Amino acid sequence: MRIKRTLLIAVLLISLSPQSVNGSSKEPATKKYSVTMKKAHLPTAPKNGTDDYRCFLLDPKVTEESIIRTIQFIPQRKNFVHHAIIFRVTDADLPQAIAQDKNGTGWPCFGGSGLGSMLSSFVSTPWISSWAPGRGKDISPTGYGTPFKKGEQFVWQVHYNLLAANG
């Protein structure tokens, strides 16, 4: 199945705080990042299929060691997106991710990030967040968050369900 001339794009909103090194109990100021796919994507399923699993490399261009405080996936067309998973890309997997996304349209990735082998993908690119219809943003409690290194990048896997294209 094919979505008729509908290119899809999504936005990832992230709030990051500088990593505290002085042990202060005061919550540091956050920086907000909005990251989008390099190019819009026209989902297509393999022959006789109804689903397209696609991964995209996202670079929030973080310039300092940080803590992820909030993260939110916002699809343009929710009726086509079954779920999305946001993965951390390790330094070891980054060259492969860059190569697979060289034209900015992502790569097929059923069952994980598509980086490394199928089984190592779950270990080498751990989940940071996920989204499904009805889910809002992830908000860490005060004083908590997910460490994020300077220059680190995300892969997001988007599962497009193309049955929605017909109705």
Segments the model singles out, each with a brief description of its role:
Residues 1-7:
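Bacterial N-terminal signal peptides that target proteins for export
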Residues 1, 21-24:
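Generic low-polarity alpha-helical segments
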Residues 10, 20-21:
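Cleavable N-terminal signal peptides
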Residues 8-15:
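Bacterial N-terminal signal peptides
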Residues 16-17, 95:
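Hydrophobic alpha-helical membrane context
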Residues 23-167:
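Beta-strand-centric surfaces of beta-sandwich/beta-rich domains
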